[in-house]
Amino acid sequence: MSLPNPAELIRQMATDLNAHLSKRGISDPRFIGIRTGGVWVAQALLEALNNPSPLGTLDVSFYRDDFSQNGLHPQVRPSELPFEIEGQHLVLIDDVLMSGRTVRAALNELFDYGRPASVTLVCLLDLNAGELPIRPNVVGATLSLAPNERIKLSGPEPLALELQDLSTAL
């Protein structure tokens, strides 16, 4: 399978996000990336938008509903939100939407900080593997993977996608 170029996806996502926000009458949203890949995508997206806004970051490790099964990620860091959440229009950015559980955890954490006016979900990739009814408002590309395949985003400079075959991993 040939994977898309993240830089090209980001450029198209910037155009699509501007159109989406304009259609909804949103002129000054707050941007939040989900660690780690979502932060990289958010940084690239803000650059493509030529937007100097501060970037918030979320680490949703403690909010995941599979925490008891998978344990705590070894590099948990605090979330950093350099702006108010209450009443704000938010753009929540993740790298890969798979089950929807990471986004659900991010929404739960955001609502602990306040009630936003709206949340626009932006994802570099949607893998159409949702276990929860969560869909991005803006997406770079939609891919279908075999059950033994995963996508890994590396970065931040340059952003690159890698297809991993879990059946050959030791």
Swiss-Prot record:
Catalytic activity annotation: UMP + diphosphate = 5-phospho-alpha-D-ribose 1-diphosphate + uracil
Single biological process term from Gene Ontology: regulation of DNA-templated transcription
The keyword Repressor is assigned to this record: no
Listed GO MF terms: uracil phosphoribosyltransferase activity
Enzyme Commission (EC) number: 2.4.2.9
Motif (PRPP-binding): 90-102
The protein's enzyme class: transferase
Keyword Transcription among record annotations: yes
Keywords: Glycosyltransferase, Transcription, Transcription regulation, Transferase
Residue stretches spanning the membrane: none
Pfam entry (one): Pribosyltran
Gene3D superfamilies: 3.40.50.2020
Protein purpose: Regulates the transcription of the pyrimidine nucleotide (pyr) operon in response to exogenous pyrimidines. Also displays a weak uracil phosphoribosyltransferase activity which is not physiologically significant.
Annotated family: Belongs to the purine/pyrimidine phosphoribosyltransferase family. PyrR subfamily.
Identification of the protein by name: Bifunctional protein PyrR
